[in-house]
Amino acid sequence: MTRPRNTQPPKVQLRLYDAWLTICELSALTPGRGVAALLPDGRQAAVFRDRSGRTYAIDNRDPFSGAAVLSRGLTGSHQGRPFVASPLLKQRFDLESGRCLDDGTVTVTTYEVRTRPDSAHTD
């Protein structure tokens, strides 16, 4: 007898502390655009999918303005590294490291991201 294949759409998960939190279905992420996700502790994450299918997550709060807007920023790449530009003051943040490309003294939190089949719990 064969096991049925998992037909659930893949989910995007963020690592928070020692657990994985399901954020959304991968299909909800439009390449080149971000979405905001409310985290259990009240913070927000900005989640992105690039055109090659890679996913990234950083803190949604723009450290220069204090507004939760990075998920609405424009994405691009600089020297082969993906970034998002704040929609307010246009500072660019590396999506892999969180470092501000325009002011090396400023960073935003990054989150480890994975894509997995749907599950009823975090592990």
Predicted regions and their residues:
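N-terminal pre-ligand scaffold of iron-sulfur
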Residues: 1-81, 94-95, 107-123
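Short cysteine clusters
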Residues: 62, 86-89
